[in-house]
Swiss-Prot record:
This is Large ribosomal subunit protein eL18. The gene is rpl18e. The keyword Ribosomal protein applies. InterPro entries: Ribosomal_eL18, Ribosomal_eL18_arc, Ribosomal_uL15/eL18, Ribosomal_uL15/eL18_sf, Ribosomal_uL15_CS. PANTHER family: 60S RIBOSOMAL PROTEIN L18, LARGE RIBOSOMAL SUBUNIT PROTEIN EL18. One of its GO terms (biological process) is translation. GO terms for cellular component: cytosolic large ribosomal subunit. Belongs to the eukaryotic ribosomal protein eL18 family. It comes from the Archaea. One of its GO terms (molecular function) is RNA binding. Keywords: Ribonucleoprotein, Ribosomal protein.
Length: 122
């Protein structure tokens, strides 16, 4: 065993990664396997995305998954559906004020099991 474990030691993140891998196999949707790989990364390599980046890369009505943390930097003026591992309260408020929707990743998988139309933002 390596002296410093790599990947998540947080049991909730490990369960989320396991859930995503099972969903990828069950639905033949490789997008969930890719999201699981990002979730399993060590803490220093995890994804951090600001709301302003979502405003730049997403179109109106897009469904977006952030395999890391969503922070409140920047402005959002598009109605989008966002799911992330963690979302700061201020970022969630900005998404909702723009007319969007905030989901957890398991909720997103249940709503879009095949992953069609879901974009990964890293």
């Amino acid at each position: 065993m390596p002296p410093n474990p790599t990947g998540p030691t947080n049991s909730q993140l490990r369960m989320l990664a396991r859930f995503l891998r099972k969903a990828a196999r069950a639905n033949s949707a490789s997008i969930w396997r890719v999201v699981a790989e990002f979730v399993e990364k060590p803490r220093r390599q995890r994804v951090i995305v600001n709301v302003g980046k979502l405003n730049r890369v997403a179109k109106e009505g897009d469904v977006v998954v952030v395999p890391g943390k969503l922070l409140a930097g920047g402005q959002l003026n598009k109605k989008i559906i966002v799911a992330a591992v963690k979302i700061s309260p201020k970022a969630a408020r900005k998404v909702i004020e723009a007319g969007g929707e905030v989901l957890t990743i398991p909720e997103l998988v249940r709503k879009y099991p095949r992953g069609s139309g879901v974009r990964i933002v890293i």
